[in-house]
């Protein structure tokens, strides 16, 4: 629940309220509330502004996940799939794109400007297995580079996960993280 709340917005609301309270208290000569409003309100407001400026919004599920896939996720999803899903569906601060460290480590875009941008997230069933599908906008990194790194991605995302890469549209890459039957046995 808390992962869906923007700390920047909370800071702006609380800081704005306290700062406004400080100005009103100053106008009515209430020194105690005036000090509280200024000493706490202005820093919280500035902190909220700073967080809002560096905020990376959660990636939406498009379309929303059906209940059958949610129960499949609970049964078959690997720890890595769950971690990726949880990381990209919450607010992040101080980074330019979701999964930036993972993409850099895998060699998909060396500079921040080259890193693909994650657009949407889907969960579905593929051949009875849970699949987490990430759709990237990848204008700087062609499909060939993604395909060269496919084996490295399979190792990176851990045992029990098969990686499939497909180009949907020009500059649009679909990365599917699919559980394998080894996950059920192991």
Predicted segment positions?
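Cytosolic juxtamembrane segments of membrane proteins
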Residues: 60-90
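A general structural signal for well-ordered secondary-structure junctions
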Residues: 33, 109-112, 159
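Short, surface-exposed ligand-recognition loops at beta-strand->loop->(often short) alpha-helix junctions
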Residues: 90-97, 138-144
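N-terminal alpha-helical membrane-insertion module
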Residues: 1-70
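An N-terminal amphipathic alpha-helical segment
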Residues: 66-75, 93-130
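Cytosol-/stroma-facing membrane-proximal "stalk/adaptor" domains immediately downstream
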Residues: 122-186
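Short low-complexity stretches enriched in small and charged residues
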Residues: 84-94, 129-134
